[in-house]
Amino acid sequence: MCYFCSRLAVNVCFPMKKSLIALAFGTLALGMAEFVMMGILPDIARSLGVSIPEAGHLISAYALGVCFGAPLTVLVARTRPLKHILLALTGLIILGNACAALSPNYWTLLAMRFVSGLPHGAFFGVGAVVAERVADKGRRAEAVSIMVVGMTVANLFGVPLGTYISGAVTWRATFGIVAVWGAVAMLLVKLWVPALPALPDTGMKGQFRFLKSAAPWLVLASVMLGNGGIFCWYSYVSPLMVHTSGFRSEDLTLIVMLAGFGMFAGNIVGGHYADRFTPERVVRFTLGTACLALVGIFFGAHVRYLSLALMCLTTACLFCVSSPQQLLILENSRGGEMLGAALVQVAFNLGNALGAYVGGLPIGHGLGYEYTALPGAAFVLLGMTAAMIYIRKYPRHEQR
């Protein structure tokens, strides 16, 4: 498996366009800013004298920033050259995380987490358009997957590193590293992203015209429900691995890294096969696999290494659908491509929030952590149903 993934990564990524590397650095900074909070939450709570639930609002503030900033930034900046928008967004990454590192109290940090989330969805939206434009013929999904690979590397290495630094030094240093990474991304965007012209201005109303069709709504529903289903389980993967699967707390760092490896491998595989076959087929197959894996987790979570293997498979599915779904929304949002691609991130984050809430319900009723996988499987099945309706309603995409 590792040999297959390594060979596939080589075939996909080399020779790699420098512009895509610049985009990947940006998504790495965003991925670390979003997900490192799960690891440093206790340190922040102790430092600022707040409870864990209050500190948890820092995660919600970031997600709210994503949902608010994605459509707003794209609509305001729709007439600007794409490179200029990316530079402004990386500047916002630097500002939000640098100010978070210097926050004197909880409320300032809460506000800065909101600011840090503002560029997230817009960067993915603009970045997806740039990746599609610079991609070689027949390799559009691979180009988008290279951009997204930064997010997976953040989960594989960035989050464990940030968690370690928070414990060894201070959580402020972790946010400082994210700001520095944002500065590196800004420099690479400045040097390597070509001066692409702005997209044709279809006006404010024209940006929303694509939403009159059912196609983008079906894609967004597939994103929200599919990711929400996986996050029903993944939001509680750490206590599940310790209390149900029988791993030690000391093993969690390695377990999180293995989950990140699954994300990395899934992203590479998804981009490759979306170009080789079609994005629709990859989405359909991957969501079906994720549904079966979650059912397997429910029945097999007490078997230590089976639970670990199913975790890697499910996190691979989480990112295997990412670039195919981005490509599908670009194909179905002509005239509002940046808004469409940004809305994918909104749907992703809404799915995360919904999944974390629904997954917590069986735990709150005294059931075991493995029960989080049951509503997760149901949500993924609904996401796959939305994808199947899309495929049947718009078969021309399967035949292009």
Predicted ranges, named:
Residues 96, 107-116, 305-313:
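Paired small-residue
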Residues 332-367, 376:
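A late C-terminal transmembrane helix in Major Facilitator Superfamily
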Residues 112-150:
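Cytoplasmic helix-loop-helix junction between adjacent transmembrane helices
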Residues 68-104:
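Conserved MFS/SLC helix-loop-helix module at the cytosolic interface between two early adjacent transmembrane helices
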Residues 281-325:
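C-terminal transmembrane helical hairpin of 12-TM major facilitator-type secondary transporters
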Residues 49, 81, 102-108, 246, ...:
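Helix-breaking motifs and short loop linkers at transmembrane-helix boundaries and internal kinks
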Residues 137, 146-191, 236:
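Helix-loop-helix hairpin linking two adjacent transmembrane segments in secondary transporters
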Residues 70-81, 267-278, 363:
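Helix-to-loop junctions at the C-terminal end of transmembrane segments
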